[in-house]
Amino acid sequence: MKQISGRDFCKLLEEREWVLKRISGSHHVYAKIGYRERIVIPIHGNKPLKLGLLKAQMKIAEITEDQL
């Protein structure tokens, strides 16, 4: 699976109409109408997201590996 930074994943979410609700420290919290879950993305410079976190957030946002 392709590695992606938190900043790049945030851009991807915003392209898919996820809205930044708040920022808590270095974590950005996104929400979308029609979804109960929130997506929390850690922004630590340009460090890539851990694989487990990335897969879990992709599942919530309904993003496939091809869309990265």
PLM regions and their residue ranges:
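Short, charged/polar, Gly/Pro-enriched secondary-structure boundary elements
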Residues: 36-39
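Histidine-centered active-site/metal-ligand motif
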Residues: 27-28, 44
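N-terminal first-folded block
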Residues: 1-24
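C-terminal structural segments of small proteins and small subunits
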Residues: 45-68
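Intrinsic low-complexity/disordered segments
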Residues: 24-25, 41
